[in-house]
Amino acid sequence: MKKFILLIILIPNISLASDGIWKGFFDINGHGAYDFTAIIDKNNIYAFTETAKTICLGQIEFPKDEFKTNLDMYILDGTKFSTAVIQGKVIENAMSGKFVTQPAVDTGNMYLVNINNKVISTKEKLGNSPWIGKNNKTDIKISFDNDSNIQGSDSNNCNYYGRLSALNNFVYNVEIEIASCGTSDGFYYGMGY
């Protein structure tokens, strides 16, 4: 009887394994511990920090067990004020790295953990359940139908209409229109979870 051994080597694709939601913190020039949430789909990254009131958009690469991202940084009204380069290591479900901004040349450290196991998979139906949130002093109520359409309103009588579509198992593409809301009226695009 002849016997043989079949050896299979699995090499994970870091890029695919990195899709999803990453949460953690960073410091600026050694000060603070600021919150940071990154939403990643393939090479696209949308990130935000509530405490620093900043939104970041950019590209991310995963060469081997490392990552590098180039981000444009915006204040909440959409005005671009800076760029950042973040580089570091990916170890299992964590990213740890250093960043530098331009033109201010602020530096800092960042640590993020993948939280895909704590978010609702895009494979699950959101179906007809209201979602309630609060933004500053504004109460927001939004519902999703079984076809991933968005409809809602808030306590300022603003109306929300739009659509979700799954980008991967944890991240949605979000297209939303805000109406009857004065200067906030318009079409907005981004990613969400």
Language-model segments: what does each one mean?
Residues F25-E66, G133-S180:
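N-terminal glycine/threonine-rich, aromatic-flanked beta-hairpin/loop signature
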Residues T54-E61, T79-S82, D106-Y111, N159-R163, ...:
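A short, polar/proline- and glycine-enriched secondary-structure boundary/capping micro-motif
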Residues G20-G32, Y46-F48, N70-T83, G88, ...:
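Long, low-complexity, polar and repeat-rich extracellular regions
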Residues S18-F36, M95-D139:
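Tryptophan-anchored aromatic micro-motifs
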